[in-house]
């Protein structure tokens, strides 16, 4: 009808990480194609098991006058909503309704940051977390390799044998779930590591698969390969130091502390000192 604004066509894609689906809605077909390529392997096909996403975000693409990606991220909880901001994006998310919006330019980095933040907030309520850690599956078991930048996450990933499946070389996704006992007699509470599309120096997406976590290794470079046990208190402190955490929220700080305590009482933690040689993998497992 004359006088009515033309309806804008909308495009959607569901990106599922760690079994949590996020639907991204946009009016830009080119941006949609970029997301489908960027998150290949984590995009849920129509009718897939996670096609009914847990959360919806509408993306408003516009030149961002305040664009400065070097500005630190801010995540604040106010009136039931999470307000997220960095130099290159602004976003808002209401957990009660599962809906939110993102204002950014047409780039993959801003929405990648929002996804990381949202997943950390979701996992904090469930006893899980995202971790500065490489992770891989071997013989049906997942191993985490945590450390600060330069500790060797990418190196240990490059050295992985052919029978290992890389989940990530940068950000590990850990969920607290019921897992089947080894003897098949039932299930027990445990931790499962999932592949992520969050990449480090390898610039390679992890495999979209998962396995129970068998051990966490705290990385350190040295003159020889060695594995040393870590006390529960030290393990908890170092685990907390490597968790992704963005929010200025006391309740979530408590949740993260509890998640770290629960994890180190359930999963063995070791310090892995290594030289950049593939033989280090003979000591893992």
Annotate each predicted stretch with a short phrase.
Residues 156:
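Hydrophobic positions on the alpha1 helix immediately C-terminal to the Walker A/P-loop
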Residues 151-153:
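Conserved glycine(s) of the Walker
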Residues 1-149, 159-165, 172-181, 186-285:
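A noncatalytic interaction/capping subdomain that flanks phosphate/NTP-handling catalytic cores
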């Amino acid at each position: 009808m004359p006088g009515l604004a033309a309806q804008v066509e909308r495009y959607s894609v569901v990106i599922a990480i760690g079994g949590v689906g996020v639907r991204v809605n946009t009016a830009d077909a080119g941006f949609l194609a970029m997301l489908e390529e960027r998150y290949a392997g984590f995009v849920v096909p129509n009718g897939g098991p996670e096609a009914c996403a847990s959360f919806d975000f509408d993306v408003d693409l516009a030149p961002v006058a305040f664009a400065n990606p070097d500005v630190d991220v801010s995540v604040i909880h106010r009136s039931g909503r999470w307000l997220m901001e960095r130099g290159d994006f602004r976003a808002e998310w209401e957990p009660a309704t599962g809906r939110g919006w993102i204002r950014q330019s047409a780039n993959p980095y801003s929405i990648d940051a929002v996804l990381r933040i949202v997943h950390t907030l979701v996992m904090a309520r469930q006893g899980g977390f995202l971790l500065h850690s490489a992770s891989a599956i071997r013989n049906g078991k997942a191993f985490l390799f945590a450390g600060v930048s330069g500790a060797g996450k990418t190196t240990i990933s490059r050295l992985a044998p052919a029978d290992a499946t890389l989940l990530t070389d940068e950000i590990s996704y850990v969920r607290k779930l019921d897992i089947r006992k080894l003897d098949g007699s039932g299930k027990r509470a445990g931790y499962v590591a999932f592949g992520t599309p969050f990449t480090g120096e390898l610039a390679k997406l992890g495999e979209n698969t998962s396995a129970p976590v068998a051990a966490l290794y705290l990385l350190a470079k040295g003159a020889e390969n060695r594995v040393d046990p870590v006390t529960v208190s030290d393990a908890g402190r170092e685990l907390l130091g490597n968790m992704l955490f963005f929010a200025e929220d006391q309740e979530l700080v408590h949740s993260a502390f509890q998640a770290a305590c629960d994890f180190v009482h359930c999963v063995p933690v070791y310090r892995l000192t290594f030289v950049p040689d593939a033989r280090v993998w003979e000591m893992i497992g």
